[in-house]
From Swiss-Prot:
Designated name of the protein: Elongation factor Tu
Enzyme's top EC category: hydrolase
Protein species of origin: Desulfovibrio desulfuricans (strain ATCC 27774 / DSM 6949 / MB)
Location in the cell: Cytoplasm
Residue numbers binding GTP: 19-26, 81-85, 136-139
HAMAP family, sorted: EF_Tu_B (MF_00118_B)
Encoding gene (name): tuf
Reaction it catalyzes: GTP + H2O = GDP + phosphate + H(+)
Region (G4): 136-139
Subunit structure: Monomer.
EC annotation from Swiss-Prot or TrEMBL: 3.6.5.3
């Protein structure tokens, strides 16, 4: 059996379930795969298969995640579900599972709970564009007014974190009843189809990497006598065409140059695009003007910064992290894309220290500027080992 060819007829969207423990995230994930696949003839994955999520390593951090996929008439979805609360935090901060949108699961029997709030905040911090809400276990609540009240509470909570609480679709239903039904057109399964419709219409289609402005982290620099300087790396986004102007950004003052050649596997190309490992020949650039850790980027598309706010997960001792807490003034290395840069941490007012296993927000000031924008991921390292993982939430200067 050869590998099935992935047919790219529909837009691809990455999505995931978030919400408080035992509110039904995994049951909903199973119900969606069942109903969607009964409708489109795909493969159903049971609750138990999803629940025994395999552990994956992302930047040295172990995260248990389940991946399922399903289709609607309009889209192909890749869906992540995590068994434990800590897995969600790690997943969202490391970007192990990039989310173009999320399904917030709230049990109508409980209403919003502490983790509901924490997941909404994290979604906001790491830049998940939109959420839709599934109000679960509605079959266990007889009182229509109570459902109205829970829905209102969820909408207000979303608004308080800058999601459009008044406009977010809220679908009511029972994931368990939908999962028990074998007919996708049954009354029990209708809530799942409504939820998928809401995802199709409310979660924006992601901009493909190739359609974004060009950026390539520089991994290596060579000089080729008579031709100039070649920088190599993997194109992160966009397209670079021979003859185009690019900027070298980060560490040193930004300089402009022209790309006079692109090669891949020793063959000359007209262009390099997102995902390609290329060498780019730069006109008039000296070998010493460029170094690993800088980026090659479309002019004016990204700027270098030193000071930023971050949301960070600090590895526990068991994960190979620190054994002791750290305080304001802690100076580890921050690994951005291809290089380590030293930086100093300032904890927010009222936060005395950060313990291994915590997630926290704080300000970082690097000793040299790095090409950055909100949403950029980084690792925190100490003597070459990873002790934390973070995402830039706001740029200060």
């Amino acid at each position: 059996m050869g590998k099935e060819k992935f047919e790219r007829k529909k837009p691809h969207v990455n999505i995931g379930t978030i919400g408080h423990i035992d509110h039904g995230k995994t049951t909903l994930t199973a119900a969606i795969t069942k109903v969607a696949n009964l409708k489109s003839g795909g493969k159903f994955i049971s609750y138990d298969e999803i629940d025994k999520a395999p552990e994956e390593k992302e930047r040295g951090i172990t995260i248990a995640t389940s991946h399922v996929e399903y289709e609607t008439d309009k889209r192909h979805y890749a869906h992540v579900d995590c068994p434990g609360h800590a897995d969600y935090i790690k997943n969202m901060i490391t970007g192990a599972a990039q989310m173009d949108g999320g399904i917030l699961v709230v049990a109508a029997t409980d209403g919003p709970m502490p983790q509901t709030r924490e997941h909404i905040l994290l979604a906001r911090q790491v830049g998940v564009p939109q959420l839709v809400v599934f109000l679960n276990k509605c079959d266990l609540v007889d009182d229509e007014e109570l459902l109205e009240l829970v829905e209102l509470e969820v909408r207000e909570l979303l608004s308080s974190y800058d999601f459009p609480g008044d406009d977010v679709p809220v679908i009511r239903g029972s994931a368990l009843k939908a999962l028990e039904s074998d007919d996708p057109n049954s009354a029990e399964a209708k809530c799942i189809l409504d939820l998928l419709d809401a995802c199709d219409s409310f979660i924006p289609e992601p901009v493909r990497d190739i359609d974004k402005p060009f950026l390539m982290p520089i991994e290596d620099v060579f000089s080729i006598s008579g031709r100039g300087t070649v920088v190599t790396g993997r194109v992160e986004r966009g397209v670079i065409k021979v003859g185009e102007e690019v900027e070298i950004v980060g560490i040193k003052p930004t300089v402009k140059t022209t790309c006079t050649g692109v090669e891949m596997f020793r063959k000359l190309l007209d262009q390099g695009e997102a995902g390609d490992n290329i060498g780019a020949l730069l006109r008039g650039t000296k070998r010493d003007d460029v170094e690993r850790g800088q980026v090659l980027a479309a002019p004016k598309s990204i700027t270098p910064h030193k000071k930023f706010k971050a949301e960070v997960y600090v590895l526990s001792k068991e994960e190979g992290g620190r054994h002791t807490p750290f305080f304001t003034g802690y100076r580890p290395q921050f690994y951005f894309r291809t290089t380590d840069i030293t930086g100093v941490i300032s904890l927010p007012e009222g936060v005395e220290m950060v313990m291994p296993g915590d997630n926290s927000q704080f300000i970082v000031e690097l000793i040299a500027p790095i090409a950055m924008e909100a949403g950029l991921r980084f690792a925190i390292r100490e003597g070459g080992r990873t002790v934390g993982s973070g995402v830039v939430t706001e740029i200060n200067e």
